[in-house]
Amino acid sequence: MPAVERNAPFTKTFIRKPGQRNDTSIPLHTEAPPPLRQPTRIARAKTLTRPERSQPQVPLINPSSGGPGFSAASRSKHRFSWWTAFSLFVTFWAPSPLLSSCCGLKDKQSRQAWREKVSLVFIAILLGGFIGFITMGLNAALCPSASSHSPNTYSRIGTGGAILGVHGWAFDIAQAHHLPEAPALFSLSTSRPGSDISSLFARSTSDQSPACRGTTAAYAADASCVALNGTLLKDCPLGPLSPATFAQYGMYNQTRKIGYGWEDVESANFSNFLVLDGVVLNMSPYLKANPSPIAADVVDLAIRQQLATSPHRGRDATITFYTNPTTRNAIKCLTQKYVAGYIDKITPGCFISNLVLYCSLVVILAIVLIRFFMAVWFAWFMAGRMSSPPRPSRRRRLAPNVLPEGAMISLNSSGAAPWANKQRPPPSQPARRRRDSAQSATPSVPDSLSVHHIGDEPYVVCLVTAYSENEEGISTTLTSLSETHYSDQRKLLFVVADGMVTGSGESMSTPDVCVSLLEADPRFGTPIPMSFVSIASGKKEHNMAMVYAGHYTRATGRRTPMVVVVKCGAPEEAADSKPGNRGKRDSQMILMNFFQRVTYNDRMTPLDYDLFRKVHTLMGVTPDFFELCLMVDADTMVYPKSMKTLTNCMMRDPMIMGACGETRIANKTQSWVTMIQVYEYFISHHQAKAFESVFGGVTCLPGCFSMYRIKARKQTDDDWVPIIVKPEVTREYSQSVVTTLHQKNLLLLGEDRFLTTTLLRTFPNRKMVFCPEARCKTEVPHTFKMLLSQRRRWINSTIHNLMELVLVRDLCGTFCFSMQFVVFMDLLGTAVLPISIALTYTLVVTYCLNPPHSFTEAIPLMLLVAVIGMPALLILLATRKVVYVLWMLIYLLALPVWNFVLPVYSFWHFDDFSWGETRKVEGEAKQTGHGDEGGSATGNAVPLRRWEDWERSRLRKKKREEKRRRELERQFGSGFHNDNASDGDPDRKEAGMPLSRPGSDSFSDSVTVSDFDDDKWGNQIGGYDETLPPPVQIVRHSVWIGDQEVIIDTEDMEKMLETGWDDKAFRARNLSSASSTNALLQAQQPQYPSAVNRNRLSQMGAFATKRDAPAVPEIPARYSMYVQNNGGGRPANGHGNSNGHYEPGSYEMERTPSPGEYASLIRGGAPSPCSPGFGPAQPYGHSSAVSGGAGQYSTGSHARQRSGGANAAYNQPHQHPPQPSQPPQPPQPAQPTRPGGAPAAPPRGAGSQGSGFAGARPSNPTGRGRSYHDRFS
C-alpha cells in the first residue's frame, strides 16, 4: 500500500487541539504528526458524591415526557403492558360483561382499576402466606418432629443434673426412692449426667429388640448385665426393663434422648462405644460376655476391628457395616439392643430451617436496634444542634421597610423582569423605543440580592389550604402562624380556598370564612376572577380564582400580610355543586407554579400576574425573594417557635430541601378513636422519622405541617438552584391525566407523600429531615368511620409511594446497609400487616400453652418483645415522657384495629380514590376524584405571557384610563356632572375649566398605544393602582339633612340594622338636641355635601357626627380617587349604561358580592365580567372584605368626599390640614366585614368607635344591586 502524505487534503483531522476545551476542531495543515488527544485519566476520588453518578429518573406518571436520553415509549410499553397482562391473568374468572352487569363497572378504566386491585390483593395474600409459612410451617416441613434429630429432643451427655440414660432415653432420678445401688447411681448422675445404665436391667429380646428375633448370632442372643465398675453380674440389680420398674423406683422419663457429640465418643470414658447410622452403641456388655473373637462371625469381627483401629474417626462404623450384606442385616438388631444414645446432629432440612430463622432474627433485630439507637442518637445529639440558630455570619439583615435594589417593578435594559439575571441580545431600535416609553423609575439592571442582604430570616410564604373547615379552625391556624416568633415583614400568609363549598353543618362557605378573616387593603379594590390552568382534564382544566389581599390582624399585636385565593370556577360551572373545586394538589400547584414562573421568568397566567402585583405591594419586595414555603392545613395550630425553628434548620444546612415538625393531637381524649392515635402519632415521629432524619431521607413529610425550600443558593452565592419549583418536580406533581390505579393512588390520595417521593427522586443527594423542636397541634378523626376513611388513603398511598421509592438507586448506603433496603422492608411490612398480627396472637397463645424449651424456639418471641419493647424504651431515653407509656398500652390493646382491620379495608378499597368521611361538604352525597372530566380541554383558553408583557399592558391600560378621565373632566369638570356651582362647593370647577390636579408626564395624552392589541388583555388585568400608598386613617363623614340634624349613636345603628330604616322613634328622641348639635357640627365640619346630595338624602334620614367626636381631617384627593381608578363599582353619581354614559338622579350605595354571592349571581344569569376600568357599570363591585374593611371608600362615600371639596387637599397628599378645635387623629386600620356585608367583630384590642356608615336609598330601581335595607333587614 503506498504511503500517504500527512498533509494531504484527505488526511485532515478533526482531532481537538490538546489543552483547549470547548474549542471546535478545524483541519490542520502541518508537517508534524497529528496531535494525539488528551490522555484519559482515571480519577476515582470522591466518586460516591459526584453528581454524574445520579441516574436521570423516568417520570412516574407520564414517561413520554422523560426528556432526552430516555426511550420513553418503549419504557412505558414495557412497564405497563406486563402489569396489565398480569392483572388480566389473575382476574380471568371475571370477564368484562360480568363486571359491567353485576358490579356496575361500566367504563373500561373502572374495570381495569378493579382488576389491578384484585391483583394487588392477590400479591398481598401471597406475601402474607409466604411470611406465615416461614414463621410457622417451615420448621415443620423441613424438620418434622417424628424423624427429627433436632437438638430440641436431646439431653446432652454431661449436662444437666440427676439424669441417667436407659436405652437412649433420659430419666430423671432426682425423686427416685428404694433404688438399688442408689449411692453409686446418684454419684454417677452428678459426675457424668446421662451415663448409660441399660446393662443394669434385665432385657428381653422380644420386648426391647424385636429385630433380633430369629437370630442365633452372639450379638443378638447376649443378655448379660454389667456393673458400673465393669464386672460381669450374674443377676441384674434393677430388675426387668419395663415401665412398672420405672414407676416402682420413681424414675421419670423426660421424653428426651441422650445426645452424644463426636468428641464424647472419642474420649477414653467411652472406649467401648461406637456409632452406627447415627446411633451410639454401648458394646461393653457384649465384650464382657465375649472377651475373645468369635470364629466365622463377620459381625463380631467388624465390631472388634472398628473399636481397635478407628478411634480417630469417632468410631463411626456405618460405612464398614454397609459394605457387607451380613453386617448390613445386623444393623437394625444392634441399634435396638445396644443403643445408649444418639449423635447430637442436625439434618439438612433442620439446618435450612434454623438458618432461615437465624437470618430473620439477625436482620429484623438489626433493623429494630439500628432504628432504636439511631433515634436515640438523633434525640440526644442531632435534634438540638439542628434547630439551633445558625452560626454568626457576615449576613447583613435587610431593613424590612427598605426596598432592596431591583425589587421595584420595572423593565430592565434587556426587556426582561427585574429579577432575571440572564442577559439577552440587544433588541432592535424600534423595540427599544417602545420599551423605553414603558420604563418606570428604576431603569437600571438590578443585581441579585446577595445572601448578606437577606440575613438569617429569609422570606417565608405560609401556604394554608382550606376546603371545608369551619371559621374557628381556620382562624386558629392563621392566628398561630401570625403569632409565631417571626417578623411580619418576612412572612406572608397565603390562603387558598378550594372552591365555593360549605362544610357539613356550617352556615358560611369556606371562601366567605377566609375572606371575613382578612382586613383587605383598599388599594386593591374589588378582585375579579382571574384565569389559570388547573389540575384537571377536559372542561375543568380552565379555572378562575379571585385574589383578596390585605393583612391578618386578629393576632395580638400583629399585622401580617395575607393573600386569600378563592377558586370560584369558570362561569360555565356555576351551576355545579362545588364550583372551582379541584383538590388540595391543585391548591398547592397555584403557589408552586407561581414561584416557578417567577424564578425562571416564565410565562404567567393572569392569576400569576395578579398575585405578583399584590404580593409585591404587600411585602415590598418582588416574589423572587421568597426562599421557603411552609405548608399548613387549615385545621392545624402551629406553636410560636416552630417557624423560626424550621427556618434555622434550613439556614444551617443548605442541603436540606424539606423539613417537618412534630404533629401532636389536640383532641386526645375526645373518644376512644382519638386515644388510640396518640402513641401512633408519637412513635411515627420520634422513631421512624428520627431514624430517617439521621440519613436525611424522611420518606414522608406530612402535609399538615412541613417546610420546603423553594430554591437554594449555590455555594458561590451567584445563582439559585430551584428545588420545589424545579420543572421536573412541578411537571410530575401537576399531572392531570392518570389512567392506572397505581397513578391514581399516587396523585389523588397521597399528594403529600408523593411530593416527598418526587423530591427524593429528583434530588437524591439532598436531605429531608425531621425537626422535633418544631411542633404543631391538629385535630384527628374522632369517629371510627372517619379514621377508616383517613387510614385507607394513607395506607394505600404509602404502599404505592414506597413501590416507587424502592426503585431509586441513588439513596444513601449500599445493599442491605442502605435506605433503599429500609424502604423495601417498610413496603414488605406494610403489605403483610394482616398476617403479622394474626401470627402474633397465634404465637402468644402457643407459647402460653407450650413454653419454649430452647433458643431456637424462642426466636419469634424475642422478635415480638423487641418490636414492642424497644419503642417503650425509646420513650424513656429520648423524650422522658412517661405518660406516653400509658398511651402505648392503649395502643397495644387496639393492635387488631391498626394491623388487621385498617389494612384489610384499605387493600380491598384500592380502587376508591375519594376522601370519604374525612372532609364532608354540605349537600354532597358521594365524593368523586378531581381528575377525570368530560369535554374538550380548555386550558388553552388561558393566556400565558411574560411578566414584562403583562406590565406593558397594565401601564398602557392605565394611560388609557387616565386619558379617558381627563376627557370626562374636560366635559363635566372635576366634580360631578349633576352638581352645579350653587351647591356650596368652593373648590368646584366648571366644565372646561383647568383641572386642579397636577399634570403627569407618565400619563401624557401624546403617548401612542395600540388599543386593539392591549384591550384584549384588559379583562385579565386588575383595575387597581397598587402604587398609591395605603390610607393612613379611616375618615368618618357626617351627613347633612335639609332642615334638621340627627345624632346617630352606635346603639341606634345596631337597632336600625335589626329593625330596618324606620327611624321615627329615635328621630323624635333626639329632636330636642338637634339645634345645639347643629351649631357644634357647623363649627367642626370643614366640608359639606352638595345641594343635590343633601336633597336626595333628606328623604330617608342620615347620620351626623357624634356630639363629642373629634374633628376629622379631610381626605386627600389621591386617596379618595381610588374607587374610580380601580373600577370597583358604579359611577358615583348614578348607574352606567352600555354606552358608558351616566344616568343622573339615581343614587345607590353598592358593594361587590362576597365569594359565595358571586356564584349565586352567575347562576342567576349575571353578565360575564367586563373591563374593570373606570367607565361602564361593572357586575363586580367591592367585595365583602373590602366593603367592610374600607366602608368609607364605597361608591356613596366616594361621592360625598368628591363633592365635599376633597380636591382642595390634593396639593398636600401626605398632610392633613390642622383643625381649630381638635388635633389630627392617629391612623386607624380598616374594619373587616363578614361576607354578606354585615360588620365583623373588631380586632382584638380595638375599641368601639364611631362608624363611617353612610346612608342609601331603600329602593333598588335597577335590580342590579341591593340597598342597605335589603341587605341588613
UniProtKB/Swiss-Prot annotation:
- Please give the residue ranges for the topological domain Extracellular: 101-117, 382-820, 879-881
Glycan-carrying positions? 412, 667, 796
UniProt feature, compositional bias: Low complexity:
1000-1009, 1233-1246
User: What is the membrane topology here?
Assistant: Multi-pass membrane protein
The record's GO CC annotations read:
cell periphery; cell septum; cytoplasmic vesicle membrane; plasma membrane
A GO biological process of this protein is:
chitin biosynthetic process
Q: What is this enzyme's catalytic activity, as reactions? A: [(1->4)-N-acetyl-beta-D-glucosaminyl](n) + UDP-N-acetyl-alpha-D-glucosamine = [(1->4)-N-acetyl-beta-D-glucosaminyl](n+1) + UDP + H(+)
Q: What is its EC number?
A: 2.4.1.16
Induction entry: Expression is down-regulated in the mycelium and shows a maximal expression in the log phase at about 14-18 h of incubation. Shows a late increase in transcription at the stationary phase in both yeast and mycelial cells. Highly expressed during the stage of white tumors of plant infection.
Ranges in the Cytoplasmic compartment? 1-79, 139-360, 842-857, 903-1273
Feature: compositional bias, Pro residues: 1215-1232
Give the GO molecular function terms: chitin synthase activity
Q: Where is this region: Disordered?
A: 1-69, 416-451, 966-1009, 1126-1273
Give the similarity note. Answer: Belongs to the chitin synthase family. Class IV subfamily.
What is the stated purpose of this protein? Polymerizes chitin, a structural polymer of the cell wall and septum, by transferring the sugar moiety of UDP-GlcNAc to the non-reducing end of the growing chitin polymer.
Under which name does UniProt file this protein? Chitin synthase 7
Native organism is Mycosarcoma maydis (Corn smut fungus)
What broad taxonomic lineage does this protein's source fall under?
Eukaryota, Fungi, Dikarya, Basidiomycota, Ustilaginomycotina
